[in-house]
From Swiss-Prot:
Localization: Membrane
Membrane topology category: Multi-pass membrane protein
Family, per entry: Belongs to the MAL family.
Transmembrane domains' residue ranges: 41-61, 70-90, 101-121, 137-157, 171-191, 203-223, 239-259, 294-314
A GO term from the CC aspect: cell-cell junction
MARVEL domain sequence ranges: 31-163, 168-319
Protein name: Myeloid-associated differentiation marker
Main location group: membrane
Annotated stretches, region: Disordered: 1-25
PTM sites of type Phosphoserine: S22
Sorted UniProt keywords: Membrane, Phosphoprotein, Repeat, Transmembrane, Transmembrane helix
Native species: Pongo abelii
Length: 322
């Protein structure tokens, strides 16, 4: 039967009585000499160099520096685990679905490193005085960019192609789930100060929208990583379609309400950045209130587009049990 190039087949696992639902995957030390293995070695080295440069001079004070250091250390650690698993052929014993885990992590790592490559130089490095610490911080940013490109390349290499039988997380909707949850986490970071939304019920609704959609998308990811999609009381494809549709509707309301109540004077908003006293001067390691409001508005629009794309692409998936 010819392959239908407009559709991608997704494998889902039906857990047997013995608890073994996924096929055995055998690794080989030779995997490290293959293009993907060499790419992961580049990821390992670049993240290691990034956090080593920063740690050697202590250039990671404050929340932005801490975030960047966490990003590089986390990506290095998980990449090392993936390489060890493949080197020792332990994929079958790995607690999560090996069909879904590596590409899920690669997508998250690309986004993490991208955020660190932007946040670290703009909110931390520019405030460092010229000298050894600044030079190390700039070099760390460079290696962070290399890591970002390396992880993004892995995603491009291993994502599902039309007509291919693969895990859900390798498909466009699966990768969009990663983007949706990551963007939601960034939104939560920007609204960590409750004064940004507690004065208006409409803004509190927006925060509830971000939380609800994040939880549902995270559940979808965890169900795939744990290969337990069959525990849902409804078919998994129906759950995904309902999740995408609900998220589109909820985010549409947030996209209207958040800018309206944050930037329109009629609803108590601040239309001009100059009126926000916290933005009157530059602060190291700090993003002022008006900039946070604007960032959340932009991220809300990005996530709405992601959910719309998720809804559209989900219609082109075919699920089969293995």
């Amino acid at each position: 039967m010819p392959v239908t190039v407009t559709r991608t087949t997704i494998t889902t696992t039906t857990t047997s009585s013995s608890g073994q639902g996924s096929p055995t995957i055998v690794g080989s030390p030779r995997a490290l000499t293959q293009p993907l293995g060499l790419l992961r070695l580049l990821q390992l080295v670049s993240t290691c160099v990034a956090f080593s440069l920063v740690a050697s001079v202590g250039a990671w004070t404050g929340p932005m520096g801490n975030w960047s250091m966490f990003t590089w250390c986390f990506c290095f650690s998980v990449t090392l685990i993936i390489l060890i698993v493949e080197l020792c052929g332990l994929q079958a014993r790995f607690p999560l679905s090996w069909r879904n885990f590596p590409i899920t992590f690669a997508c998250y790592a690309a986004l993490f490193c991208l955020s660190a490559s932007i946040i670290y130089p703009t909110t931390y490095v520019q405030f460092l005085s010229h000298g050894r610490s600044r030079d190390h911080a700039i070099a760390a940013t460079f290696f962070s960019c290399i890591a970002c490109v390396a992880y993004a390349t892995e995603v491009a290499w291993t994502r599902a192609r039309p007509g291919e039988i693969t895990g859900y997380m390798a498909t466009v909707p699966g990768l969009l789930k990663v983007l949706e949850t990551f963007v939601a986490c960034i939104i939560f970071a920007f609204i960590s100060d409750t004064y940004l939304y507690q004065h208006q019920p409409a803004l509190e609704w927006c925060v509830a929208v971000y939380a609800i959609c994040f939880i549902l998308a995270a559940i979808a990811i965890l169900l795939n990583l744990g290969e337990c999609t069959n525990v849902l009381p409804i078919p998994f494809p129906s759950f995904l379609s309902g999740l995408a549709l609900l998220s589109v509707l909820l985010y549409a309301t947030a996209l209207v309400l958040w800018p309206l109540y944050q930037f329109d004077e009629k609803y108590g908003g601040q239309p001009r950045r100059s009126r926000d006293v916290s933005c009157s001067r530059s602060h190291a390691y700090y993003v002022c209130g008006w900039d946070r409001r604007l960032a959340v508005a932009i991220l809300t629009a990005i996530n709405l587009l992601a959910y719309v794309a998720d809804l559209v692409h989900s219609a082109h998936l075919v699920f089969v049990k293995v």
